[in-house]
Amino acid sequence: MRRACLWMAVCAMAACATSQPQPEPAKVTTAAETFQAKLDARNEVPPPTLESGASPSGTATFTVQGPSVAYKLAAMGLSGPPTAAHIHVGAPGAAGPVIVPLAVAAGSSPGTATGEGTFDVSGVKGKKADGSAMTLDDVLAAMRSGDTYVNVHTANNKPGEVRGQIEK
């Protein structure tokens, strides 16, 4: 009997030793990173040609989640329907090349524009200084450093009518 109890105690201890609770694996969560731009005609380079008293403005939001970027933009007070919208590389006050084209359409009211969509590496059209293609990581690095802007173009202002620096 004593031997049986001892044997059961050894088995119980062995079972406890091998069934230690294991820590739960870490859950990988990627928090969304958000950037914004306040669009204003006074930020555009070169300055747009506007009617007296006109002051186009707008907003753009970019949300990074994994390997893609979702965006929303809205502009108002434009001289006409939008013809294009882009993300460019460029410091404040400097014009730069297009790196990502954005979808934009005329809004429901005259002089307004809206755009919404998502882009990934296939939507990146920019080139690095060495001529190689930019990656999404290159675009995000430029956005994080404050060296990108978004603008909306119209037929009256082909270089751009309203612009905002992209900031965190």
Predicted regions and their residues:
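Positively charged n-region of N-terminal signal peptides that target proteins for export
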Residues: 1-4
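Bacterial N-terminal signal peptides
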Residues: 6-15
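Metal-centered catalytic cores of metalloenzymes
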Residues: 16-85, 89-168
